[in-house]
Amino acid sequence: MQLSDFSFELPDELIARYPLETRSASRLLHLDAKGQYHDHMFTDIIDLFEEGDLLVLNDTKVMKARLKGKRATGGAIEILVERMLNHTTAYCHIKASNSPKAGAELFVGADNIPVIVRGRHENLFVVEFSQPILPVLEQYGQLPIPPYFNREAEEIDTERYQTVFHNPEKIASVAAPTASLHFDEELLAELDQKGVKKTFVTLHVGAGTFMPVRTDDITNHVMHSEWCDVPQETIDLILATKARGNKVIAVGTTATRALESAAQAHGGKIAAWTGDTQIFIYPGYEFCIVDRLITNFHLPESTLLMLVSALSNRENILAAYEHAVKDRYRFFSYGDAMLIDKLEV
């Protein structure tokens, strides 16, 4: 399967660079189990879900992971914290005119907090901070909004690039689980009133989510690693949902990858799991848990577009995307949403 099989034309003006005034005011394109698409508003999910269905949400929180700084010589640098190893050490991306060597001292924030490059880990730098990382990020960091916004993070992003249900103790992502950004408290309350249940998994989203696929044959692509947790409480609800004939609805590709990683770790069995995942889902993958998926519109030739193509099929997804472009849907993180049903075969 070739990378070019997942290409489509997207006018630049359809990239949503700011959120709508109201979270749940987005549009929704429903791709049903027969491969037919239907236009809705996002709030129509109330009518598209059944009592007893189960929403699975990712409760991670986005860090203010981007730090501006300088070398001892004064040259500008930028650090993006990818993963904290402990309170003062992290794997980081570093942008600089020349790649810093082990032992290099850098300074971040307005107060020039010292950090030291201790070495490399694959394509990342191991960086030791002179102070606890999270308070430094909170005081001096910026939210690492996606590169296709083509702007700096602003005050509006502080609220709107986080989900309303994030767990403040689980602050470790460098990107939001964007399908969840459409849910506000009012919509969640309406779903609860209807009898749609919800549960949580955790997947801390890494910067690799924005990395392009660089192999023509997609099966040669190696996914970045992300930490996830699928607790027993969630598994119990999933098993009960399936036992009564209801649907498991993953909210976002991150929740999907967490759930399917847990199943793959147990040979396809639905069971709890915690660990690092590099799961790569593309057409031909057999889903073990997910019946329906809420997701945003994704970049051409991205692993996320390949994932959604596995749930329906490539032709159906690209036809739906072509319709979305013609009908002026908004794309990417702050854009509109899709509800994709597993294709009936």
Curated annotation (Swiss-Prot):
UniProt GO BP: queuosine biosynthetic process; tRNA wobble guanine modification
Give UniProt keywords alphabetically: Cytoplasm, Queuosine biosynthesis, S-adenosyl-L-methionine, Transferase
Assigned GO CC terms: cytoplasm
Kindly report, in one word, the top-level EC class recorded for this enzyme: transferase
- Primary location class: cytoplasm
Tell whether Acetylation is among the UniProt keywords: no
The UniProt record lists the EC number as 2.4.99.17
Tell me which Pfam families the record gives: Queuosine_synth
Q: Where in the cell is it found?
A: Cytoplasm
As its record notes, the protein acts as a catalyst of: 7-aminomethyl-7-carbaguanosine(34) in tRNA + S-adenosyl-L-methionine = epoxyqueuosine(34) in tRNA + adenine + L-methionine + 2 H(+)
Q: Which family does it belong to?
A: Belongs to the QueA family.
The protein's matches in HAMAP family, at most eight in alphabetical order, are given as:
QueA
What protein is this chain from? S-adenosylmethionine:tRNA ribosyltransferase-isomerase
Q: Species lineage, top-down? A: Bacteria, Pseudomonadati, Pseudomonadota, Gammaproteobacteria, Moraxellales
